[in-house]
Amino acid sequence: MNIEHILPENIEKRSFEIIEQELNGRYIPPMEKPIVKRVIHTTADFDYLDNLCFSENAVEKAIEILKKGAVIVTDTNMAKSGINKNALKKLKCRVECFMADADVAEAAKAKGITRASASVDKAALIQEPIIYAVGNAPTALIRLDELIKQNVIKPELIIGVPVLSLIHISEPTRPISIS
């Protein structure tokens, strides 16, 4: 294995060059390509080329929603930390993660549910346009699906890339439908 020595300021650029080479001319819709490349850059996982799915016009809708001053709700503080605060400020958006909130922990314990589910319940009270970014908790996606079916919420956008849970592995995998 050869180690390529790169100046710190060139690491990201070189990473994207390598990704582009690995794509080997593969077609990715132009609006989705920067996102796919960013996911691969962040994870070093080229399987996302085959596993990342976008709903029709999802990127265009996301841009439109962000321009309206959306609230992005994440299921981890790490995801919250990774969202560009300067971009949020320019767009008059904000990002929230309720997972560590005392009231969420209390609600989860009282209801016998996960903090992820209780966090979704808390986020359901937000009145602004909302984007859910779920990258860790399958129960957050399950709760979102329940609240959508009950017509309690109608999120503008859901980004769901949760870890696979052995508990939920037997449940059929299907996308959450938002019309």
Regions found by a protein language model. Name each.
Residues 1-30:
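Charged, compositionally biased N-terminal leader segments and the immediate start
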Residues 27-41:
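N-terminal glycine-rich anion-binding loops that anchor highly charged ligand groups
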Residues 42-50, 105-107:
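Short, basic, glycine/proline-bearing loop/turn elements
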Residues 50-65:
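A short, well-structured juxtamembrane/interface segment
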Residues 72-74:
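Short hydrophobic beta-strand that contains or immediately precedes a catalytic carboxylate
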Residues 76-147, 155-156, 162-164:
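Conserved mixed alpha/beta catalytic, RNA-binding, or beta-rich assembly cores of soluble enzyme
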Residues 167-179:
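Single conserved hydrophobic/aromatic residue that forms the stacking wall/gate
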